[in-house]
Structure formats: C-alpha cells, structure tokens
C-alpha cells in the first residue's frame, strides 16, 4: 500500500525516492529521505511522530558557550567602570551647571509675534448685546420666541406696549375666545372659492 513519490530536480537529486506518510505510519521497513542533498536512514516509529529539529553538533555548542562566557565577562567588567564614573572634578561640574543655565528656553518676551497670529477676537462674534439706545428691559419678553422684524413700525409697536402687568394682558390674536359661539368661529374660517364651471364637457 506504500506509494513512492519521486522527487523533482528542483527539490533534490533525480532518482531519489521519498516514502509517503502511509509508509511511515504502517512501518514498512526503513525509508530514505532526501533532505538538502543528504540521505538519512530513518527507522519506522509507531504512533504519532513529530519531526524534531536535528541535534546541534558539539562544535556549535562550544561556540555558543564561549559567546556566553564573553558576555558574562563584559558584564562583570562594566560594573567597576560605573563606580569610577561619578568621580568628576569640581571644574567639570561647574561647567555642566553653566551649560544647563544657558540652555534654558527664552522667555515669552523674545517672541512677541506669537500674539499677532490671531488678529481677531473670537468673542466678538458671540456678543448679543444691544446698543444703549434700544432698551428692552421693560418689554414683556417672557416666553416670546425669537422674532425677526422687517420694518421699524413693528419695533415701535413693541416699545409702545409698556410695562407688563397681570391685570392688563392683551389677548394674542391667534388664540380663540372661549365665549364665542362655534358658528362665529366657523364663519371666520370660511374661504370663498371660485365658482365651478359646469360648461366643460367630460
């Protein structure tokens, strides 16, 4: 049942054979694998098999060991150097403080042009104050919606209303009087329509 797969020229040497997975699972004798031009004999293993990377030779382990030793030595040598660094002379310390003082950023007086970037005041566009000539403090404006007055006559009418009082309250024209009869209300709603032309042939 084991099927053999022939490896192409790109993957390995021509003529080398690689056993399929079925052959490895069934344990059909030793098989030859072509890996990077090397031939390795693998014995059949039962159960699940996982391809583990090959063990590194001892030479590479020695190289890694020497690298680790070198880094340990360098870490050890850095310790005493750090202890020697704080011993500076007084002249060097004073030079550093002078440099730090000279590197302080300049004050705001050195850049007066920054204030001129915004030539207008944004609050000017949000002012809702009226000039002193038009006083509206004595007008009954509670609950009045915003009105746009086209003519000055309407503005004069508003000024003539006088101070608000609970006794003299003018009834607004859009509210209907409750004492009126329904017929009088309906008479105000009648609209004259044009006469119907009956002469048109359908």
From Swiss-Prot:
Motif placement: SH3-binding: 163-173
UniProt superkingdom: Eukaryota
GO biological process: cell division; chromosome organization; DNA repair; homologous chromosome segregation
Residues with N-acetylalanine modification: 2
Any one GO MF annotation of this record: SH3 domain binding
Family per record: Belongs to the securin family.
Protein name from the UniProt record: Securin
Species this chain originates from: Pan troglodytes
